[in-house]
UniProtKB/Swiss-Prot annotation:
The keyword Ribonucleoprotein does not apply. PANTHER family: PHOTOSYSTEM I REACTION CENTER SUBUNIT IX, PTHR36082. May help in the organization of the PsaE and PsaF subunits. The lineage of its organism: Bacteria, Bacillati, Cyanobacteriota, Cyanophyceae, Acaryochloridales. This is Photosystem I reaction center subunit IX. The gene is psaJ. It comes from Acaryochloris marina (strain MBIC 11017). Keywords: Membrane, Photosynthesis, Photosystem I, Thylakoid, Transmembrane, Transmembrane helix.
Length: 51
């Protein structure tokens, strides 16, 4: 068996990254914002610590 050189298509990988990373970031930040909004709705003033 001969060794087959690994072909790396960097442009394809680059475009795949930029098509998936923003989608994952959008979902993550949307869920985080929704969680904080609901947390503040059910437990008001828990994010504010008066001294």
């Amino acid at each position: 068996m001969g060794d087959v050189p690994l072909k790396i298509d960097s442009e394809k990988d680059f475009m795949k990254f930029f098509s998936t990373a923003p989608v994952i970031a959008l979902v993550f930040f949307t869920l985080t914002a929704g969680f904080l909004v609901e947390l503040n709705r059910f437990f008001p003033d828990i994010l504010f610590f008066p001294y």
